[in-house]
């Protein structure tokens, strides 16, 4: 039996980043992974999707070249080459992770993990015991429990990332982050895209004003989006798939060559034997406290598996919090201030409270908004669609930032830093920004 200071189950961002930090702090770590290191994000999520987003953005640029004085632009999308580049990007980054965890303080075990007792885990035919255990097993794509969900051509996001040709017609069930990103990508690649969303608006957890504007923008790009659409079944229809749904009391149907199920994710807890060791969990994930500790002492859960926030960077920082708790280290992490991004065209970036959040919590607030059409850099880029909205308390303290437009995912980080520090609108107004830059949009909103 191997004895170590810390066992980490899962080598995604929440697992391998925590393992590296623990090793740097002098702990011995057993890191267990049943698949490829890097987790969903690197192998079948954030990274491969962003590689495709880059190609889609280039296609969009070529299509608009004449507006910039570049005429007679002809190009052909070589989809196999696009996918090969995607695989190369993933491999490069995965090789980097493999190199990082080749650390004398980290013992990598490849195999399915299961608890023997609270502090003993078995994997790859070997038992490991430790003082503390961190579960970082991530999540898997959910499927609607409807007839036809197992038909050929009904895909998860992982499966869609491995297709060998662009579908002529693509139906996406779910208008969350995953659904809208794939809608943008495959629309740019030439697919006829229809998105069906059960809620009243796309991106249900984002600022509702922003979500509406994004939906309208995607519609102008040829993406058909139906909200308040309850998908009932999927059936074979000729060479395609008929997706039946109900919208406002009317039965409707859309035919597609491929159907993407983008209806959320579920925590990977099935094979761990959690019930046997008394860890409390539900379909939403493993229950944890503010230090990411479960109800069983010395057993922690970070990332998607606890269901708090299914984002790679949230997993990383939850891992830091868990390790700090294990080692008795005080930290100043603000795990309530987690930015999020949607890599559509245009992008979305957000952090903190929305207007709806403030109303629900009874918080008096002020909303300030500046538009990219008045930003010099955005006009030069020809990307003027969108705005930055700041949410502030009546005392000026910054509570939220919501950006829809070029490079929104990057721009929101400034507001994230300010909110984390507890800074105010006045503090933001006093920060000098370079001109002309997109970042001026954030300060412009502060002055509105």
PLM feature segments, named:
Residues 1-12, 166-173:
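Beta1/beta-strand and adjacent pyrophosphate-binding region of the FAD-binding site
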Residues 2-3, 20-27, 32-166, 194, ...:
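Glycine-rich flavin
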Residues 2-4, 124-132, 249-258, 295:
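Core beta-strand elements of the Rossmann-like FAD/NAD(P) dinucleotide-binding domain
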Residues 7-14, 18-35, 40, 47, ...:
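Flexible, glycine-rich terminal cap/loop adjacent to redox cofactors
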Residues 15, 179-180:
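N-terminal Rossmann-fold NAD(P) dinucleotide-binding loop
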Residues 19, 23, 183, 187-188:
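Gly/Ala-rich phosphate-binding loop of Rossmann-like dinucleotide-binding domains
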Residues 150-167, 253-327:
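FAD-site-proximal beta/loop scaffold in flavoenzymes
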């Amino acid at each position: 039996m191997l004895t170590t200071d810390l066992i980490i189950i899962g080598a995604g961002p929440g697992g391998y980043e925590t393992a590296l930090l623990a090793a740097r702090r002098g702990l011995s770590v057993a890191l267990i992974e049943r698949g490829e290191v890097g987790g969903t994000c690197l192998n079948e999520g954030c990274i491969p999707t962003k590689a495709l987003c880059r190609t889609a953005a280039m296609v969009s640029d070529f299509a608009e070249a004449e507006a910039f004085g570049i005429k007679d632009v002809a190009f052909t999308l070589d989809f196999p080459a696009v996918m090969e580049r995607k695989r190369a990007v993933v491999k490069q980054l995965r090789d980097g992770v493999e190199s990082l965890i080749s650390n004398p303080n980290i013992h990598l075990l490849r195999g399915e993990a299961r608890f023997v007792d609270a502090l003993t885990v078995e994997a790859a035919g070997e038992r490991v015991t430790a003082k503390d255990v961190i579960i970082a097993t991530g999540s898997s794509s959910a499927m609607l429990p409807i007839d036809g969900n197992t038909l050929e051509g009904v895909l998860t996001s992982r499966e869609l990332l491995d297709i060998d040709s662009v579908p002529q017609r693509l139906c996406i069930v779910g208008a969350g982050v995953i659904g809208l990103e794939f809608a943008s990508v495959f629309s740019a690649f030439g697919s006829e895209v229809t998105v069906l969303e059960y809620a009243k608006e796309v991106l249900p957890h984002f600022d509702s004003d922003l979500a509406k504007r994004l939906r309208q923008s995607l519609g102008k790009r040829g993406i058909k989006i139906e909200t308040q659409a309850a998908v009932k079944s999927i059936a074979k229809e000729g060479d395609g798939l008929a997706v039946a749904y109900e919208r406002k009391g009317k039965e409707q149907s859309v035919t597609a060559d491929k159907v993407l199920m983008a209806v959320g994710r579920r925590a990977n807890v099935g094979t761990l034997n959690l019930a046997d060791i008394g860890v409390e969990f539900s379909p939403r994930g493993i229950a944890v406290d503010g230090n990411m500790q479960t109800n069983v002492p010395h057993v922690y859960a970070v990332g998607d598996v606890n269901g708090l926030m299914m984002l790679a960077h949230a997993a990383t920082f939850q891992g830091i919090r868990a390790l700090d708790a294990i080692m008795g280290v005080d930290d100043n992490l603000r795990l309530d201030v987690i930015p999020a991004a949607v890599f559509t065209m245009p992008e979305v970036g957000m952090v903190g409270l929305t207007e709806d959040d403030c109303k629900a919590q009874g918080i008096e607030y002020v909303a300030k908004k500046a538009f990219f059409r008045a930003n010099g850099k955005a006009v030069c880029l020809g990307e003027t669609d969108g705005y930055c909205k700041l949410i502030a308390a009546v005392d000026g303290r910054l509570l939220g930032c919501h950006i829809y437009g070029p490079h929104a995912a990057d721009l929101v980080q400034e507001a994230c830093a300010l909110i984390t520090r507890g800074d105010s609108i006045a503090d933001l107004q006093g920060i000098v920004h370079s001109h002309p830059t997109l970042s001026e949009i954030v300060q412009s909103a502060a002055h509105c």
